[in-house]
Each structure stands twice: as structure tokens, then as C-alpha cells.
A protein has these predicted regions:
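A transmembrane-helix-recognition feature enriched in membrane-embedded lipid enzymes
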Residues: 190-196
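N-terminal Lys/Arg-rich, disordered targeting/topogenic segments
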Residues: 1-24
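N-terminal type II signal-anchor transmembrane helix
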Residues: 18-53
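A structural signal for short, hydrophobic/glycine-enriched beta-strand patches
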Residues: 45-190
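Short N-terminal helix-initiation segments at or just after the protein's N-terminus
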Residues: 6-12, 28-34, 62-65, 92-95
Length: 196
């Protein structure tokens, strides 16, 4: 009787096309994970940006404004005029730019013009954040400064603080993050200016 004969079980052989499909899916899945990680990381960066200081502002020996936008200069000059420091350095100023040009461009009040001419030094040497920090180190050491307020864009502040703290380990650094008017970080994924 053929029903009594034991037949060896057939083990299913893995389909070769399934393995090939998995090999093709793996890079796509890894790319998707990478893109999701990048988006999540950028979202975290945007949500943790320093915000403008409110309340009483602590006096510092100096103010350092890193060029890159008129709003930074406006804030720096205002802080100086309000007595938040005795001296200010504008670092990374373009060649040929002087105080008279700044007065024209910024539309300063008389008190701000007086502060600009008496208490502000222009640094034309710095080309980047590392250069800003080196110029600031020389400037602050020449004046015996122990505390500085950094004025730069909010998205630039974390990097600037890192570089400046390495260059000026014995100087207390305070931040003054500027929220650029033309940068909408609440809807950064829709705003082309935010993405650049």
C-alpha cells in the first residue's frame, strides 16, 4: 500500500527573487531612515534656537557684533547706547566700510552716532567665525575684558558660542541672539529663505 510509505518532507526552498527584492529594498529603507533623521535633526535645531533675551540685561565689558545683517548692527548699537557695555567691536566689516558709511546705512540717532565714534572699533580682518573669534580675543585682551556679549543671528549663535569659548576660555560669554525678520523658522519647511 502506497499510503504506508513514508515520504521525506519537502522543505520549501527560499525563493531567490525574494532575496533580490530585499537587497533592493534595503538601500531604499536606509535612505528613508537617513532622510527622516536629517529632517528630525533639523527640526530639533530649529526648536532649540536661542531666543532674544528679555528682562534686565547684565552689563558686560564689551559687545561683539558679527557682521551678516543690519539687524545685528542695530541691536549692537542699541545695547551700547543703553549702557550694556562700554565698548563694542564690529567684527568682519567689509574693506572700505567705515563709521561714516555705517551712520548712513543704519540711520542712527545722535546718541548712537556719538557712541559709534567714541566706543566702537571696526575689525576688517575676520572673514569667518573663526576669524571673528581671533580678532575678538586680541581686542578683548588689549582692553583687559572679562565678559563679552556676542550679537549674531539665532541660528548662528550655537556655533559662534562654541568657537568663541574655545578661543576665549577665561572670558564670560553672554549671548544676544538676533531673530532675522526675513527668516520664518516656525514654518521652515515651506519657506525657501529658511531652507537656504
Amino acid at each position: 500500500d502506497s499510503s504506508d510509505i513514508e515520504r521525506p518532507e519537502r522543505h520549501a526552498q527560499p525563493a531567490r527573487h525574494g532575496t533580490a527584492t530585499n537587497r533592493r529594498r534595503y538601500p531604499l529603507m536606509m535612505a528613508a531612515v537617513l532622510v527622516a533623521t536629517l529632517i528630525a535633526s533639523f527640526q530639533h535645531f530649529v526648536l532649540t534656537l536661542p531666543q532674544a533675551t528679555t528682562g534686565q540685561i547684565q552689563f558686560t565689558d564689551g559687545i561683539v557684533v558679527m557682521t551678516g545683517g543690519q539687524q545685528r548692527l542695530d541691536d549692537g548699537v542699541r545695547l551700547l547706547t543703553e549702557g550694556c557695555a562700554d565698548k563694542m567691536l564690529i567684527s568682519g566689516v567689509g574693506k572700505g566700510v567705515n563709521r561714516a558709511i555705517l551712520v548712513q546705512e543704519l540711520g542712527l540717532s545722535e546718541a548712537q552716532i556719538n557712541a559709534l565714534f567714541c566706543c566702537v572699533e571696526l575689525d576688517h580682518a575676520a572673514q569667518d567665525t573663526f576669524g571673528n573669534a581671533k580678532s575678538t580675543r586680541e581686542w578683548s585682551h588689549s582692553h583687559g575684558m572679562q565678559s563679552l556679549r556676542l550679537v549674531t543671528a539665532n541660528y548662528h549663535m550655537p556655533r559662534a558660542l562654541l568657537i568663541f569659548s574655545r578661543e576665549l576660555p577665561n572670558v564670560d560669554l553672554y549671548q544676544w541672539p538676533v531673530n532675522p525678520d526675513d527668516l520664518d523658522l516656525s514654518n521652515w519647511w515651506w519657506d525657501p529663505a529658511s531652507l537656504r
